[in-house]
């Protein structure tokens, strides 16, 4: 079984004080590079897709490609639903073989968030799928969701304790000052808050918006309980910058088998760096 739940890999990371990287995928090349590099480094791996990614590529196609790559590289991996909000959509995707779910009800009032998350937990656990939920809101842009900085709310540690207990989630995404997309100013993470959250809950913690963070901040967050680190924008920038540079040098190029090579090489360097920072190399 090559498409697995992320629950056990995150619990192992929690016990051994490293983090599992979750790379957002957008096309075939992204999936190829991420799986190949993780396999070479014997790193646990989560492939994450937003609703927009699954809509763009087709859920069945994503599942089939992920399964084929995992088998080719002998790398069991978690295929993850990132920032999903609709129960019916989640149900279809879990039934299609996906075993890792992030239900995002962070835009809703607390009681509504709890109710939605509980319903997703009840569904997902019937299929042995793990569930991540977010408490608090990150600023920035993720897929079609835009959260202004003034609307971003940090996670309350005591509320996190209640949230985890009432929902039965397997991991908790925390808001401590990160943001989706590119940072317009130097991020200042609330590590004191993160430590307090860790002391209030026993599930692995998740850090969204890691692209652009200093390596030292990521390592410190891992030391304070973060077991899953999400990376999206950094991969997209590496991919697109390499493509742009190739076409500037080769304006007549038209063969994707050629111009995708430098783009894949650029992404590979990002994946290697993230795995190194997460401390998960050789943890399979």
Swiss-Prot record:
Please state what the protein is called. Answer: D-tagatose-1,6-bisphosphate aldolase subunit GatY
One GO MF term attached to the UniProt entry: tagatose-bisphosphate aldolase activity
Broad enzyme group:
lyase
To which species is this protein native? Answer: Klebsiella pneumoniae subsp. pneumoniae (strain ATCC 700721 / MGH 78578)
| Amino acids binding dihydroxyacetone phosphate | 181, 209-211, 230-233
Key words of the record: Galactitol metabolism, Lyase, Metal-binding, Zinc
Gene symbol of the encoding locus: gatY
Subunit organization? Forms a complex with GatZ.
GO aspect biological process, one term:
D-tagatose 6-phosphate catabolic process
